[in-house]
Amino acid sequence: MDHARAALSNLFSVEPMSYTRFSIARQTDGDNSHVEMKLSADDEEGGDIERPEHMHVSMAQPQRNGKRLCFLVIAAVLLLLIGFLIGYLSYRGRIELAARCQDGSGGCEITPTASYLVDGEGTVEEEIQGPPVIFWPELKAMLSKKLSAKNLVDNLRWRVGVDSFEAGEAEDTNMATYIHEEFRNFLDKVWNDEHYIKLQVRGSTKNQVSISINGKEEILETPDAIVAYSESGSVSGKPVYVNYGLKKDFEIIQKVVASLNGTIVIVRAGKITLAEKVANAKEAGAAGVLMYVDSLMYGITDTLIPFGHAHLGTGDPYTPGFPSFNHTQFPPVESSGLPHIAVQTISSSAAARLFSKMDGDTCSEGWKGAIHSCKVTTKQESQIMVKLDVNNSMKDRKILNIFGAIQGFEEPDRYVVIGAQRDSWGPGVAKAGTGTAILLELARVISDIVKNEGYKPRRSIIFASWSAGDYGAVGATEWLEGYSAMLHAKAFTYISLDAPVLGASHVKISASPLLYMLLGSIMKGVKNPAAVSESLYNRLGPDWVKAVVPLGLDNAAFPFLAYSGIPVLSFGFYNKDEEYRFLDTKGDTLENLRKIDNLDALLAAAAEVAGQAALRLTHDHELFLDIGRYSEELLAYQEEFLPYIKEVRELGLTLDWLFFARGDFQRAVTALRRDIANSDGENRVIRRALNDRMMKVEYDFLSPYLSPKDVPFRHIFFGKGPHTLRSLVEHLQLLKTNRSSVDLNLLREQLALATWTIKGAANALGGDIWETDNEF
């Protein structure tokens, strides 16, 4: 037994069981010897072996060092193998359980283990053990179960019996206070944002439209509605009808009428926004614009007169590019989108009387609409004139945007924003009430899931109620302008809830390509209100992307995408062939909205799509953004450019560099996908860096070579101006249709801006600066 103990002692002891006292100082007598005291294993056990009674002066010799080292190596290898097997089996078990949870085939209770993580500043923090993880199938089922159609309709009743919620007025402020209090009941953080803006409102005298025949004046209408940002004053001119006021409509009419200078243009509502119609009329030389609602497209609307605005842009037109904070010293500038011509809306009955008094050529069948007495213009020698008196006045008003937030647990400084317009010129039930109702219900439900069901969103969710939306998304745009330096780096998606139900026949989707894949996935899990046995995805089919409606200036999501470079999503229901007749009128009431079949189910479906989008974007480790979709969009544009290669070369230019830039972007997408596949999914720092590269793709398509003050909508896909890819295509088309009108210097600039914006987006997506170069 003693020999066995001695053997074990020798095996696990690197040094002999002895200690030596060395003389530190040099010995004066030159003796460099040392004294050794040897302790045997037997001594430790208190055995009977005789103890040495003298000190050894000789050095102990190591024994069996080679054999001992061999045993140590074998023991270490065995321990390593055992540890590896234990870790592998444990990890495999967790992965299998996670897979069962994701597809809903098994139980879903996994408790995170504690691990030490390094954040971006280099400090070490311990991840605290939390409650069981809620997996996506369970989370979306919670949302669907908790959403209440009854609550949605109840939230609409706030607008019953109120004639107007005009921005900055008492009813708008009262609604803001109510929303603020509701947010306080549900959310972690609630705050207000004040802006001081210039709005054009009704004057002390009503506007008036009259017709003069041989000097005899007759009043056609004195409408209650106004068009904000119209030029005030009195103007007269010959009436000319230009259908919907599209550019192609003006091209057609200019072949019939020698000149439109000084005329009063008549257009019908639809196809494009009123502001775009007015801009086209101004470009053609018109002195004023009258717009009416045609019952062929809107149903029976003889007496309805819509409100509107004529600013070709968003935000406060008197502080373009600047936030309208009270302490800002504004420069004396105004938006280039202001029309400076008189604009007024009239009823279809007034338009019919006006047409009946015109004596020119009859409209073509495609232009007639519901008014069969439609005339294009008057005879050249006739003395028929239309007079437009506009008495609008400017007012300085304070508006409130209301915000509430659910803070994320892993990346609280990254957030998805859900917003809805609150104000309206009339009752605004469909225009603003439905979106606000969904906003409040989502705030309640998602807060309940977080507080009571244990869901811990990785990223924050911000709920926003905007004011002055009827004046051109003023509240939303001023917020973007005020916090642009922060928002483009932190807000990664905006979900618009405005006007989600304007009909029941068709689904209306407007979105950034980055969110197509997310939306397709969500629609597979939301029931079709028209047939609950199928999903929304089944209703639309696999080619639903082809039905995506481009965002317009009348959508509050537009400045988020085109001005700030934030991916956006807008979802709702409408009738494609018949506009909602009461929109922007005094008839936009709950009673009229109730005429839409299955209203409750439509509201619930729209709310569920928006809620699922917000939850999915805060649930997964990896952001649900499809970066490869923009590569497909670029390829589609490249196919449009191909027919003009020869004509471009004849000008001494080339499209090759533009094509090479697209290739660079595709390679950057492939590289990022490879980095994601090869990364450690459990490393929070790496995950955040990869997500940041994805979330900035949209922003990188804002042309960096343009001033946001002069060209606010800089997005090369969805912006407005000659820098866009669509404008480049239209310019190239002139090479075949009207070569003499091609501006060579502009074409050079367009090619350069497009090429280097795409190349810059590819470089940013590629990662660090040492991973990029300036070669194609």
UniProtKB/Swiss-Prot annotation:
Renumbered ranges of motif Cell attachment site: 662-664
Spans within the Cytoplasmic topological domain: 1-70
InterPro entries xrefs: PA_dom_sf, PA_domain, Peptidase_M28, Peptidase_M28B, TFR-like_dimer_dom, TFR-like_dimer_dom_sf, TfR1/2_PA
Subcellular location: Cell membrane; Melanosome
Chain segments carrying region Ligand-binding: 586-776
Residue positions of motif Endocytosis signal: 19-22
GO terms under biological process: intracellular iron ion homeostasis; iron ion transport; positive regulation of B cell proliferation; positive regulation of isotype switching; positive regulation of T cell proliferation; receptor internalization; transferrin transport
Protein name: Transferrin receptor protein 1
Organism: Gallus gallus (Chicken)
